[in-house]
């Protein structure tokens, strides 16, 4: 879902070719096609592929697979306020834009007012019959209409930023999307998230096979 205020601004009205490039690059990361020849590669092929939707929720074919352009009333938006659902009436209006989360991963692309945030995502709900530590467990999607935009948001300010074989950029949108989709699928950060800003090496990602680390020392 591309939110735009000015169709002449490429950072708002992102062209379909760029969006396809980003999804393809994200798939390459998840399928270990980028780092497979690196000397210290410990990545794995996740046997997973993200597909651009070919049909809208009503069953009609999409003119541009996986892409919906939505005219917005402001050129940028606070991603936290858009995502958190605390303003219930506003959240319900935003939620009308998402497609059935049981069938689609909803990704919203728009310029963030906070330019230091590259992307943001909700963690998923796990079914009560298959609970997972670290996630909200319950049949939320089966019992409720979604009352807020449960989605991934990507800051389109950096939509054309990506690393190449010569130069690395920390604003790489390929990595940002792959990272946020990891959260959407249930992954926490591997570094310590103890909530006290003490930067202790606590294992807080609920995965014993990923060693924790002190992000302050690492960076």
Regions found by a protein language model. Give the residues of each.
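Intrinsically disordered, low-complexity coil segments
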Residues: 63-68, 72-77, 85-86, 118, ...
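The catalytic-center signature of Zn2+-dependent metalloproteases
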Residues: 157-219
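Propeptide-to-catalytic entry region of secreted or membrane-anchored zinc metalloproteases
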Residues: 1-103, 110-113
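Structural recognition of the beta-strand scaffold that forms the well-ordered cores
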Residues: 1-2, 49-52, 104-109, 150-156, ...
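A short, structural micro-pattern
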Residues: 44, 101, 146-148, 201
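Active-site scaffold of zinc-dependent metalloenzymes
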Residues: 116-169
């Amino acid at each position: 879902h591309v939110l735009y205020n000015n169709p002449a601004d490429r950072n708002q009205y992102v062209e379909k070719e760029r969006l396809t490039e980003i999804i393809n690059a994200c798939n390459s990361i998840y399928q270990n096609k980028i780092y497979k020849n690196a000397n210290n590669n410990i990545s794995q092929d996740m046997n997973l592929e993200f597909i651009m939707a070919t049909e809208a929720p009503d069953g009609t074919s999409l003119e541009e697979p996986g892409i919906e352009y939505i005219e917005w009333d402001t050129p940028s938006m606070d991603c936290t306020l858009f995502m958190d659902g605390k303003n219930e009436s506003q959240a319900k209006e935003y939620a009308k834009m998402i497609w059935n989360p049981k069938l689609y991963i909803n990704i919203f692309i728009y310029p963030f007012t906070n330019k230091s945030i590259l992307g943001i995502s909700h963690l998923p709900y796990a079914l009560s019959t298959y609970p997972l530590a670290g996630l909200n467990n319950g049949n939320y999607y089966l019992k409720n209409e979604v009352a807020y935009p449960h989605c991934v948001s990507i800051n389109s300010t950096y939509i054309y930023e990506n690393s190449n074989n010569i130069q690395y950029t920390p604003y790489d949108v390929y990595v940002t999307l792959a990272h946020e989709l990891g959260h959407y699928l249930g992954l926490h950060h591997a570094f310590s998230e103890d909530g006290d800003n003490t930067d202790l090496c606590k294992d807080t990602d609920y995965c014993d096979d990923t060693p924790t680390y002190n992000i302050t020392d690492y960076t």
